[in-house]
């Protein structure tokens, strides 16, 4: 296991680059949310005794390995190191973390601006929809269970959940929402929910959940979804929700606003 690897491993100096987060900002870390892949990579390498830090071009000859993660394809970043690993949809939509790294609890301490009382992660991966603007179905495939909410929480009470379509997970989603309610987690599904999937069974639970900023997010990407969003919001209100709704929209494109 990891403990055996640590004992025989030649300790390395690891550099991390959050291309989206560092490219346009002076501060260290993500613009808004931490990069989950880099947080897991940091946890893995620290676990086997490596030194992990943000890549500093002034010391570029001192790195044994540099990981570059890019979600979007807008930025380019040039580095020098003995070994460079590039990952994320900005480089290759099919890139994935090795299983032994993906199973690690992320180390958010690499980010100076991430709240220590908040955890970030996914309950599911994938999505059954095939929206023309989205790479998730091509990258991750059909919806499937990923991590239990208690594993994501890892002792924290605030959770930012980045699932692309949690409600499409059916009974698994119901079970996870029930656990969120029982545990008293305060959550945010920051990639939004699919209003078309909101049934009475879901609405009852969504109304009971403690939401960060008392806000539920929905995707209203096209004009045809306006009616479904209104239906879902009215249904959740009918079960006693008194917070606010946040709708994502797309400007331009097929059926866009």
Show the residue positions of the predicted features.
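Flexible, charged surface loops at secondary-structure boundaries
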Residues: 8-11, 58-64, 78-81, 114-115, ...
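N-terminal [4Fe-4S]-dependent radical SAM core
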Residues: 5, 12-13, 21-23, 76, ...
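Acidic/glycine-enriched edge-of-secondary-structure segments
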Residues: 29-52, 130-134, 185-193, 216-223
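Surface-exposed amphipathic alpha-helices with a cationic face
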Residues: 80-82, 135, 233-240
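Catalytic cores of alpha/beta
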Residues: 255-257
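Core AdoMet radical
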Residues: 16-19, 67-71, 135-232, 243-253
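Hydrophobic positions in alpha-helices of CheY-like receiver
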Residues: 45, 180, 236-240
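A short, structured N-terminal alpha-helical element that caps or precedes a catalytic domain
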Residues: 1-86, 91-93
């Amino acid at each position: 296991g990891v403990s055996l690897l640590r004992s025989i491993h030649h300790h390395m100096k690891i550099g991390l680059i959050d291309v989206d987060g560092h490219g346009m900002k002076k501060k260290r870390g993500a613009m808004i949310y931490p990069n989950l892949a880099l947080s897991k990579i940091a946890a893995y390498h620290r676990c086997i005794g490596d030194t992990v830090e943000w890549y500093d071009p002034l010391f570029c000859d001192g790195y044994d390995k540099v990981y570059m993660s890019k979600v979007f394809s807008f930025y380019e970043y040039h580095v020098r190191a003995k070994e460079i690993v590039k990952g994320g949809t900005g480089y290759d939509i099919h890139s994935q973390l090795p299983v032994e790294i993906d199973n690690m609890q992320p180390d958010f301490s690499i980010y100076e601006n991430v709240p220590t009382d908040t955890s970030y992660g996914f309950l599911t991966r994938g999505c059954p929809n095939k929206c023309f603007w989205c790479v998730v179905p091509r990258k991750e495939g059909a919806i499937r269970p990923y991590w239990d909410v208690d594993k994501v929480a890892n002792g924290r009470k605030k959770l930012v959940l980045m699932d692309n379509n949690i409600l499409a997970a059916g009974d698994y989603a119901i079970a996870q929402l029930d656990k969120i309610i029982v545990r008293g987690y305060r959550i945010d599904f920051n990639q939004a929910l699919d209003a078309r999937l909101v049934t009475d069974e879901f609405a009852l639970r969504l109304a009971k959940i403690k939401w960060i900023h008392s806000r539920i997010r929905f995707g209203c990407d096209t004009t045809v979804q306006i009616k479904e969003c209104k239906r879902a919001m009215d249904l959740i209100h009918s079960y006693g929700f008194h917070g606010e709704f946040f709708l994502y929209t797309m400007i331009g494109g097929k059926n866009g606003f």
